[in-house]
Amino acid sequence: MSHYHRQGGPGQPHDSYEDQQQPYYTDQAHSGYDHHSYHQQQLYHAAYDAAQPEYQAAPVKPQRQPSRIRSNSSGSRSVSHTPAAYTNQGIPPVPSNLSAARQRSDPSQALPPSSSSYAQDAFSRPSYSSHRNAPNAPNSNHPSRWDPNASYDTAPTAPLYDPAPLPGSGQLDADPSQHSIDLGVREPLYDDQVMQQHYPYGGAAAFQRSDSYQSGRPGAGGYHSIDDEKSIHSKHSNQPPGAWNAGAPSMPYNNMPTSHSTIQMAQPAYPPSPYGEYEMHATGMPEPNMSIAGLGAPGALIAAAPMPGMQHHDSTYSRENRERIMRKRTVKRIPLQDGNLVLDIPVASSISKSTTNNPEFREMRYQACTSDPDRFIEEKYTLRPWLYGRETEMAIVLTCYNEDDVLFARTMGGVIKNIAHLCSRTRSKTWGPDAWKKVVVIIVADGRKKANERMLKALGLMGCYNEGVMKDHVLKKPVEAHIFEYTTRVQITEKGEVKVTPCPIQVVFCLKEQNKKKLNSHRWYFNAFCQMLKPNVCILLDVGTKPTGTSIYELWKSFDKHHRVGGACGEICVDTGRGCTALFNPLVASQNFEYKMSNILDKPTESVFGFISVLPGAFSAYRYKALLGRPLEMYFKGEKLHSGEGSNSIFEGNMYLAEDRILCFELVTKEREGWLLRYVKSAKAYTDVPDRVPEFISQRRRWLNGSLFASYYAVWHWYRIFTSGQPFLRKLWLLFQVIYNLVLLVFSWFGIANFFLAFYFLLSASTSTEGSDPFGGQGAAIVEIFQNIFIAMVIVVLVCSLGNRPQGSNFAYTSAIIIFALIMGLALYAAGYTIYLALDAAGLTHTNGWRVDNLETLFKTSGFRDIVISLAATYVMWLLCSLLHLEPWHMLTSFVQYLFLTPTYVIILSMYSMCNTNDLSWGTKQSNGPATDLGGATGCNSKQDGKGEMVDVKIPTSAADAEELWTHYRQTLSQPTVEVKQKRDKATRQEDHAKNFRTNLVLIWMCTNALVVIIFTSTWWNKYVRNHIYAGAVRRGEPVINPYQSAIFWSTAGLSAVRFVGSITFLLLRLFGH
């Protein structure tokens, strides 16, 4: 086409009053743009949506920022005050990369970069290295003009382009004959009906927006009048009534020239902010993100949660409805962009209502990635935040496997609250109203067929997933991951409600085609996405872990305050349910106590040393530049080991079951760098813990094996402390920690023996005093019985651990836990009675007052001294530290449960993990081979000039299709989740049955043998023999032989005699020919 606009818009007369009175620039002011009312804008939205989108040329990002220069040149041509400013051309969607943007423009009439001052200033913020040292008032100190004649180095460092007019940017009016682009009319952003004072971040009453608002009451309602500041709004004496009813955000171009400026074709342009820029004054208010979006105030309900008794469609209806929607997809012929399938798909209008045509909120971007994550950039894949040229301060990754929508909503809700908190920090040098632009939330699902369907539909309701666009092959190349990008403004609550978020959230959803485990998910995060976004801080979360409202900020602050911090973690708390009802389960209560004491004793101690042995992957943070090099290289070495591509070392395989421990060690001992690890007490996150025995044992097997072998690795490589960049005193301090960890490792190795001996000595001490027996004179028999029961249960656990899955031996493991709890109770009773005997021996049980000589006698008693000191060093210290940390409640609610389940942690879990060091799995099965159920992007043997190879894809093409699919997702999620008991398939049941038969047979065999040994070696049997069977021999002084021994001897002789007789008989028969 010969030009890029059409005169007039549909239904708009060329000589309308507003067109005649609203030029691009006015002679009465130096503020930039004039504006039409909101209603004028709506007249052209239909034309914008109906037109075929056109791409603008993608400029090249210069190596230095020229945005502080503006032209004072007066040679620019004037702009015609005609309705030509309005075009029916659609808002161009975001070009996916540099090549594609160039290809979509006619080479003969290529569009130059936009001359919009809006675009010029979008990247005039301080550089990445110093942006935290500058106040969060964007572009406040820029010169007022950009010199179009300035020369720049055009070497491409990163593709940046000028997406079409976004909020408040207006439409471009291009004249290719002049090789320049004129500034278009800046359209209004607010409507009278929606311009309410919704302050998404709280406390906004103290702020005032920098807009001018004129509706017969200048300055009223907390807004500045036009006289208050140099606004972009000009004061027009001939302005028609109501023309300024809709304000627009103030832009920092305070001294714009009265004549119109153009930018020459060769000059670089900068992308405008996709959500508008606000100029913060001393009393300015945060950007009202959601009130301008058309969705309503933060927290506004878009779809209600399912109600009890609500009628629901059955699964057959939902399946048929989905198939009907999938059949409505249209086959489109589109060009590949740099050989990659990249699509911009409209999202449902229910979640994209807006007063602007911003493609960031109206379209979801999909990429079918066929490359390995290590080659993501090399294969020219891109991400939207990078295309927009945004600096990413924080990248938050949420890894998931098959978690449901409730767990996902819990985690995502916590993340959204944290980002909203960052936006509320208006006095921060880094954060503020636009903080959401510096945070990218990356969700990585481990396997398309393993992912929970309800979680995927929850992402679909947020606009971050559309199953209708996914392809499993692109030109016969299998797809490795499906990448969806969308800046969402809605969230799903745990109750199933769809609500407006406090601020927009940049989401990247990576759905891996195959299940390749968590390490591979982190490789996508670090080596693909972070390598492109270059975040300062990386936050790691597991779906199901819910950070509290300010936790992520607290983690980030530890990096911002201390430049040597390379990693940090917060406190992971057990989710005890509403009213702490989950604590009625002893398993949950014991884990709650274990987590609390670890966060009170272990983590603070290790943080003082500067080396935390493990930063839990469920909630931790790292400085990205600290991870580069050997730490990430060693971290991802475990992926090859678990996939069978690396060495066959069982030691390394178990070591990488706790790969986060390896990462921490490599980070602290990194050569020529002195990074430290910190524990941040104020950062908390809640997580679910196993509440059933099989899941609990399976989880701890991986943890214990990984931590044991990783501890060996850290102790064995202690010398690497001295090759790191740590200061000398820190090296000595870390060496002391290595010695401390070595002692803990030794105690862990002998844990079972130490526990048995402690139990044996306590019972022996309580029954050693003649005439004083805590068991009514049967102390010796009780000690012997329980000693044998202890040994028997160790044998039972050993046999079960050698071959049985916990899921197939639930009864055996549960019985062992109960019996060991009784043994622990008996040991505590014996310890208490021993202390009583010591008090009685010191005369303290019969006196009215304790004297010094009584206390001296008491502490000279070894039984009291040793037991009391050891118990006080443990239990009393727990209580004291809990009180000092102002967190004593777990001592009341969970201490007793943990006390009785201590043998489970020391014996059962340790034995099961040791017996399964050959199992290097994470409890999931890796799927192999590419899938072919989605359909692919097939070649059509045709090319279009400048557009590369064309492919045919079947996709939804309109917002109506997206809305229908969104409604289907909503209907499906409105059906309550049916609690389905876990069932084993036939093969697994047969395998478990065979293993149970083997285990039962071995146990019967071992137990009967042990029973014989126990009976005929017991003290009772020996007394019975001496007093009844051989009483006469005892009186005569003859030696007493155990009758069982005699029976064994005579039986052996008899059996030998039988064999002797048989052998002689055979010879005789052979002699006589038989």
From Swiss-Prot:
Region of interest called Disordered, as start-end residue ranges on this chain = 1-32, 56-179, 209-255
GO function terms (MF aspect) = chitin synthase activity
**Listed CDD domains:** Chitin_synth_C
**Which conditions up-regulate this protein?**
Expression is slightly lower in the yeast form than in the mycelium and shows a maximal expression in the log phase at about 14-18 h of incubation. Shows a late increase in transcription at the stationary phase in both yeast and mycelial cells.
Report the locations given in the UniProt record.
Cell membrane; Cytoplasmic vesicle membrane
What Enzyme Commission number does this protein have? 2.4.1.16
Q: Which reaction does it catalyse?
A: [(1->4)-N-acetyl-beta-D-glucosaminyl](n) + UDP-N-acetyl-alpha-D-glucosamine = [(1->4)-N-acetyl-beta-D-glucosaminyl](n+1) + UDP + H(+)
**Could you list the residue ranges that cross the membrane?**
608-628, 742-762, 779-799, 817-837, 867-887, 891-911, 1001-1021, 1048-1068
User: Which family, according to UniProt?
Assistant: Belongs to the chitin synthase family. Class II subfamily.
* Name used for this protein in its record: Chitin synthase 2
Q: Which organism is it from?
A: Mycosarcoma maydis (Corn smut fungus)
